[in-house]
Structures are given as C-alpha cells and as structure tokens.
Design a protein with these regions (language model features):
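DNA/chromatin major-groove-contacting recognition/catalytic segments
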Residues: 94-97, 101, 105-107, 199-214
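Active-site/catalytic core of tyrosine-dependent DNA strand-transfer enzymes
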Residues: 31-32, 96-156
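Catalytic-site neighborhood detector that most strongly recognizes the C-terminal catalytic loop/helix
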Residues: 84-88, 123-124, 186-211
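Short alpha-helical segment immediately N-terminal to, or the first helix within
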Residues: 55-56, 70, 171-172, 185
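Short, polar N-cap/turn motifs at the start of nucleic acid-interacting alpha helices
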Residues: 73-79, 156-158, 177-196
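Basic, Lys/Arg- and aromatic-enriched nucleic-acid-binding interface segment
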Residues: 3-64
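Short, basic (Lys/Arg/His-rich) helix/loop patches that form interaction surfaces
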Residues: 36-44, 135, 144-184
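Conserved tyrosine-mediated DNA breakage-rejoining catalytic core shared by Y-recombinases
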Residues: 10-11, 69-105
C-alpha cells in the first residue's frame, strides 16, 4: 500500500461535506392539482390531511404544530394572528376564501373563542404541555402517512405537511418577493434559515441555465 509520504493530502484536514436540506418544495401546478382533487369518496383522515396541507400552503406556510394550536379567538377580521411556537414570533396572514372554507368545514356549530379551530386537540382532554405535544406528534404521523399515499397518486415522492411550507416560500421567491419578506412571513429568526429553504430552488435554476452552456 502507499506510504504516508506518497499521499500528498495527508497534511490537509478533509472536512465532511455539509449535507444540504432535502428538497421539499413542489411545483405550483402540483399544489393546484392536489387542491382540485375530488376526495369525496375517501376516508376522513385523507380529506383532513389534504385540507391541512392546503391550509398550510395558503396560510403563509404555517406549520402543523401552529395549525393544531390555532383557536377561533386567533381569527380577527378574516386574518389569523398567532405566536409561532418554535420562535415566539407573532405572525399574521390574510385568510383567502379557500382557507376560510377549510375552517368552516371543521368548525363546530357551537364553537367558542377558546375552542381549537381544527379537530386535532381537545381542550378538555389535552391540557398539559406533554399531552398536547404527544397528541400533535400522533396526529402529524397519521396526516403525513395519508399525504405520502396521496402524493404517490400524483407522482410526488414523500409529500408531507412541511412540503406545503417549503412550496409557499418557493412560489413567493419565483414571484419576485424579497427574501426578507418571505422570512418574516415564515416567522424565521434569521435570513439564513429562509435561504436554506430556497437553496434547492436556486440550484434547480442554475442546473436549468447550465443546459444552455454548450
């Protein structure tokens, strides 16, 4: 075998490559197909999972935990105001007609301001932080399982709730929205986190552009 002297890079430290974030965004056209799909003959959880996915996309990329914690008191004049659990940032976004329709679909006819919007948490059953976290963890597992099955029908690999968040950010970037505004709407603590979301999109653009080099 080769001696150490014969290995010219021995004195250099070879650092591990930073593993990039897995590409999670999908095309806007794919989102629209998911939204338009007729799921009337499917089970409740499949329909619910699609609705949560669409609500996240239309709701400025709101993540599953924050969706689960939303209460009717968070709705003010067709806007949602909530505090992002992960960063503590206060976020608000306008509710589109499609998002309002999803809310109406799951609202109890006798709901109060203190009731959760979506049937994920029950205010009488899930009272401690541990009970709330466990319930959210359990439901997101079911939702993502249904989304992955649904995604396969549309030729989309690994469709999860987080794909909606990443796609929201990517669609805004493609529309020319400033990254600082996207970052603010996502509730990120700094721009570098948002950049990670958008890197795969920019890499795709570079790959496409490089087809024209020769």
């Amino acid at each position: 075998y080769a001696s150490k002297e014969a290995y010219p890079f021995d004195k250099f430290k070879v650092s591990k490559f930073n593993t990039p974030t897995t590409k999670r965004a999908i095309e806007k056209e794919e989102i629209l197909k998911i939204m338009a799909a007729d799921l009337s003959d499917r089970d409740f959880y499949t329909r619910f999972s699609r609705d949560i996915f669409v609500f996240s996309y239309l709701g400025a990329g709101i993540n599953f935990t924050d969706i689960a914690l939303l209460k009717h008191s968070d709705i003010k004049k067709e806007r949602i105001y909530y505090t992002r659990k992960k960063t503590g940032k206060i976020i608000n976004f306008k509710l589109s007609e499609q998002a309002l329709e999803i809310i109406r679909r799951y609202a109890s006819p006798f709901y109060g301001d203190d009731d959760y919007i979506f049937p994920i948490l029950n205010k009488t059953e899930h009272t401690t932080p541990l009970q709330i976290d466990n319930r959210i963890h359990k439901v997101i597992g079911h939702v993502n399982s249904k989304l992955k099955k649904l995604g396969k029908e549309f030729g989309i690999d690994n469709l999860t709730t987080y794909v909606a968040r990443h796609t929201y950010a990517t669609v805004l970037k493609r529309s020319g929205v400033n990254i600082a505004i996207i970052s603010e709407s996502l509730g990120h603590s700094d721009l570098s986190t948002t950049q990670i979301y958008l890197d795969s999109f920019e890499n795709d653009q570079i790959d496409e552009a490089m087809q024209n080099l020769l």
